[in-house]
Amino acid sequence: MSILQLENVSVIYGDNVQTKGLNNLSLETKAGEFVAIMGPSGSGKSTLLNAVAGILPATSGRIQVAGRAIDGLSDEEAAQFRREELGFVFQEFNLVETLNVKENIVLPLMFQHQSVDVMEERVTKLAEGLGISAILDKRVTEISGGQRQRVAIARAVIHQPALLLADEPTGNLDSKNSKEVMSVFKELNEQLNLSIFLVTHDAMTATYSDRIIFIKDGRLYNEIYRGDDELGYKQSIINVLEMMGE
């Protein structure tokens, strides 16, 4: 079953000088697949993520998430779609500093008007799995960058989204915390069969994925699959990036 389909999608923006953020791009990802998106700066990676999220409308083509066409949704419908079907993890964490860790995590469930029992059950289970049970009552200003990203991940998946979108989630982390956070993504993917669509410029981060889609100038440039050879996978990533001029 496909979780995400793009058919000949183009995104053109700008008034006086028009830019093609995506140029007739087609791709498909399966449910439960962990896909990384790589490419040079300005290649269209963030544009792709915003188009999939329904934030940036496609100029032409068709986008489906979990069997639902998202092109043509009204602003209100797109917002509801994002709340129900998508989870987001960003480089900057985007946590609410006036709330504690637990309150940040349950925010999506509050918007869905879930019961307190459901909130308690889910946050307890997630916190245990992510190793953040001991910090649930702390303010986000009192925890480390790696812990903040774990909290952001918990918030992104607590409402059980169809697809998790991540934009440079290790960009503000050191190598140790980056590896720990990517291990969390991999565990969620494997244990919950969570579909993940992750943008990164970092080869190490990309090695945690099942497949990497490379885009350049808004077009599909190449794609590679992980297989069983992790070292070979990383070398293939480096080879493609070198061909792209990265």
Task: Specify the residue positions occupied by each region the protein language model found.
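Short coil-to-helix segment of the ABC ATPase nucleotide-binding domain corresponding to the Q-loop/switch region
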Residues: 99-107
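A short, proline-enriched helix->beta-strand linker immediately N-terminal to the Walker B motif
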Residues: 158-162
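The feature captures the beta-strand-to-loop junction immediately N-terminal to the Walker
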Residues: 38-40
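Helix-to-loop junction immediately C-terminal to a conserved catalytic motif
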Residues: 53
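Catalytic Walker B motif of ABC-type/P-loop ATPase nucleotide-binding domains
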Residues: 164-167
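Conserved ABC ATPase signature
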Residues: 139-143, 147-149
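Conserved ABC transporter NBD signature motif
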Residues: 61-69
